[in-house]
Design a protein with these regions (language model features):
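Conserved N-terminal structural module of periplasmic/extracytoplasmic solute-binding proteins
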Residues: 11-19, 32-125, 129-130, 141-145, ...
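Hinge/lid segment of periplasmic solute-binding proteins
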Residues: 119-175, 202, 229-232, 319-323, ...
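Extracytoplasmic/periplasmic solute-binding protein
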Residues: 160-169, 174, 184, 199-251, ...
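Short, Lys/Arg-enriched N-terminal segments with co-localized hydrophobic residues
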Residues: 1-9
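Extracytoplasmic/periplasmic substrate-recognition and gating elements
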Residues: 79, 84-87, 186-189, 271-272, ...
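C-terminal motif of bacterial Sec signal peptides marking the signal peptidase cleavage site
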Residues: 27-31
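Long, aromatic- and glycine/proline-rich binding clefts that accommodate carbohydrate-like moieties
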Residues: 153, 320-325, 370-426, 430
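Glycine-centered hinge/linker elements that transmit conformational signals in sensory
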Residues: 203-207, 247-280
Length: 434
């Protein structure tokens, strides 16, 4: 009925207006960041044994996709000339969400760790305004070989007022993983690179549903990572207007037809095509559904590939059941990543922290990160060994499919105000029940 339609659009508008409110609040909070006092003490960087002790809050622990890689990285650094005099003092926080909340808290009041690992959220400006992270511009200027590892876009993304504060350690891309067996069971032939349109994609979802298969993984807890990737794709592939919107940093007006249409489609996905525990559900649970063959498709990046081989996470042989495709309309999320920052104040600590960032982004370790954690090299001039492509066919597919994307776009966790991101994930259940 017209009345029902009217109410439906009012609910959509409500979600979008809440996003706008979130944006305005974000502006206020970001503005306040510049007045926060620097509470860090200029403590000596050396312990009694003459070692430089670097404090690090590490979320790459436990079952995190990059836990093994970061353990290797910290240990290997201590065996180098620059790191042989360095010790790490770790505080472990096991989820990115809790880590990001902690770092934001320390930016506003407290001491940041000496190395500030990136948690995926774009907090560079917030941290730079606080005066608690080091300007790294001169270190890059003094080491041209190191600077050449990064594109201008990567460094601009990690800059504030023309100064570089973050060193990006990988490139973020995402696309769709699908379960070949479930597609076969539903009588669907997967497209070579992706569905040409969202209509074709939803036709496949309907076929899966008809066979009792849940089409897609979605979530709402911990900022709703999977739901955000679908949402970014819906907007980012909606012609030039949508693509421009998803490639813009810190947009302030969400009352556009492309955002409204994407919101309506996301609502349909939450209501019709996902698991019953998606609302309030965390990423880990939704990933497990995919590993267990309970869901046909999940959007994510290459860092998930090692999990397909891990019998701690997925059944034996699961890797061979997984295929990849671009998002409908030949879309792929591709953004520069927020980089690691230096929160140290003592000169010895700063020197050691910068040396660690150089080690972390060396060509050798970018390949190691790809191999061990599925992290895409940040440097475009790095040659991926054929042996790695041969031993990891899915990763080879990922490296190949990137060139076939017609639309590349950002995702909201990287490009939107933090408060908008928070409001968005909080409103997902209301949108679904709407």
């Amino acid at each position: 009925s017209n009345r029902a339609k009217e109410e439906y659009f009012m609910r959509k508008k409500k979600l979008l207006s809440l996003l706008l409110v979130g944006t305005m609040v974000a502006g206020l909070i970001t503005g306040c960041g510049s007045s926060s006092k620097d509470t860090s003490k200029s403590d000596s960087g050396k312990s009694k044994g003459g070692k430089v002790v670097l404090n690090v809050i590490n979320y790459h622990v436990g079952t995190d996709y990059a836990a093994d890689y970061y353990k290797y990285l910290f240990d290997a650094f201590k065996k180098t000339d620059e790191g042989k005099n360095v010790e790490f003092n770790f505080e472990e926080i096991p989820t990115t969400d809790a880590f990001n909340q902690k770092i934001k808290l320390l930016i506003s009041s407290g001491d940041l760790p000496d190395i500030v690992l990136n948690g995926g959220n774009n907090i560079t400006a917030l941290a730079a305004k606080s005066g608690k992270v080091q300007d790294l511009t001169q270190y890059l200027e003094d080491d041209k070989k190191w600077k050449a590892m990064f594109s201008d876009t990567d460094l601009e993304f990690n800059s504030y007022k023309g100064k570089v504060y973050g060193i990006p350690v990988s490139k973020e891309i995402s696309y769709i993983y699908y379960n070949k067996d479930l597609f076969k069971k539903a009588g669907i032939e997967a497209p070579e690179t992706g569905y040409a349109t969202w209509d074709e994609f939803f036709a496949a979802c309907d076929k899966l549903k008809a066979k009792g298969i849940t089409p897609v993984s979605m979530d709402s807890a911990d900022l709703g990572w999977l739901s955000k990737l679908w949402y970014s794709g819906l907007i980012g592939t909606a012609g030039k207007e949508g693509n421009d919107f998803m490639n813009k940093q810190y947009p302030t007006d969400y009352n556009t037809s492309v955002v409204e249409d994407a919101t309506a489609t996301l609502q349909k996905m939450l209501q019709k095509y996902t698991t019953s525990d998606a609302l309030g559900g965390k990423y880990d649970t939704m990933a497990t559904h995919f590993f267990n063959g309970e869901v046909a498709m999940l959007p994510n990046g290459p860092w998930m590939i090692p999990d397909f081989k891990s019998t701690d996470k997925a059944p034996e042989g699961f890797y061979d059941k997984v295929g990849i495709m671009l998002l409908p309309g030949s879309g792929m999320e591709s953004v520069p990543t927020p980089g690691d920052m230096v929160g140290a104040k003592d000169p010895d600590k700063i020197k050691a922290a910068v040396a660690f960032l150089k080690f972390e982004t060396s060509a050798e370790n970018q390949i190691k990160a790809l191999e061990m954690a599925g992290l895409q090299p940040v440097s475009s001039n790095i040659e991926v060994p054929q042996s790695l492509k041969d031993s990891d066919p899915l990763m080879a597919d990922v490296l190949e499919v990137q060139s076939k994307a017609k639309y590349t776009y950002g995702q909201n966790q990287a490009y939107w105000y933090q408060n908008v991101i928070d409001v968005f994930s909080n409103q997902l259940p209301e949108l679904a029940y709407g």
